[in-house]
From Swiss-Prot:
Principal localisation: membrane
Family: Belongs to the PlsY family.
Transmembrane segments: 3-23, 54-74, 90-112, 127-147, 152-172, 183-203
Cellular location(s): Cell membrane
GO cellular component entries: plasma membrane
Gene name of this polypeptide: plsY
The name this protein goes by in its record: Glycerol-3-phosphate acyltransferase
GO aspect biological process, one term: phospholipid biosynthetic process
Source species: Mycoplasmopsis synoviae (strain 53)
Keyword Transmembrane: yes
Subunit structure: Probably interacts with PlsX.
Catalytically driven reaction(s): an acyl phosphate + sn-glycerol 3-phosphate = a 1-acyl-sn-glycero-3-phosphate + phosphate
EC number: 2.3.1.275
HAMAP family, per database record: PlsY
Length: 224
């Protein structure tokens, strides 16, 4: 009985995260305040980068933090609330599933015909949910790679791969800064969840990968 209930609880966690993640900030902000659908411009992507092109950097920063925060919120909501209803001693469930589901919702939002972003900002939220130290680590690698390559997409993809190594360190998932995941399964559970998130990022960047291989991907221009 506990096994079936554990499965049901994890399915519930997934749906909670997915519905939260489907609240795509760039689409909502664009339609509410600018009467524009960000998906109709430039890359057609509903994320912070395209919002920068359409609405400017101030709005893009707000959207970026919303996309990050909603993943953290979904994970911590499950981590804080669910133990009051479902005892972790009786049932096996994983709060980080809510974070992964929120990333999927960001990429394929149910409220907006499943046309969303590429999930990069949402993956940052997933990293924070695992361990807040992973955020600055990822940031350092991303900006170093961006400065070196000038490609936002390539920097995002390489940083995604690099972070697998850091997540594989047991302390990152079970240490004092891992409140949302510590005590909910072994550290390898987080690795598996992150691998799914990484796979989604690569899938959503498949056109960028083609352009990178053909050397037609646009480079970031730095102002002096």
């Amino acid at each position: 009985m506990e096994i079936f209930l554990s499965i049901a609880i994890n399915i519930l966690i997934f749906w909670i995260g997915y519905l939260i993640g489907s609240l795509n900030a760039s689409i909502i902000v664009g339609k509410l305040f600018y009467k524009k659908d960000v998906r109709e411009f430039h890359s057609k992507n509903a994320g912070a980068t395209n919002s920068l092109r359409v609405f400017g950097y101030k709005v893009a920063i707000v959207i970026l933090f919303i996309d990050i925060f909603k993943v953290v919120f979904a994970t911590y909501f499950v981590r804080i609330v669910f133990p009051f209803v479902f005892s972790p001693k009786l049932y096996f469930y994983i709060p980080l599933i809510a974070g992964l589901a929120a990333q999927i919702g960001q990429a394929y939002p149910i409220y907006f015909k499943f046309r969303g972003g590429k999930g990069v900002a949402a993956t940052v939220g997933l990293l924070i949910s695992i361990n807040v130290l992973l955020w600055p680590i990822a940031g350092v690698f991303f900006f170093l790679l961006l400065f070196k390559t000038k490609y936002v997409s390539l920097s995002s993809l390489l940083t995604t791969l690099i972070m697998i190594g850091f997540i594989s360190i047991p302390w990152m998932s079970q240490g004092v800064l891992s409140y949302a995941t510590s005590g909910f399964g072994q550290f390898w559970v987080n690795i598996i969840i992150y691998l799914f998130a990484a796979a989604l990022i690569f899938w959503k960047h498949r056109e960028n990968i083609k352009r990178l291989l053909s050397k037609t991907e646009n480079k970031m221009k730095f102002k002096k």
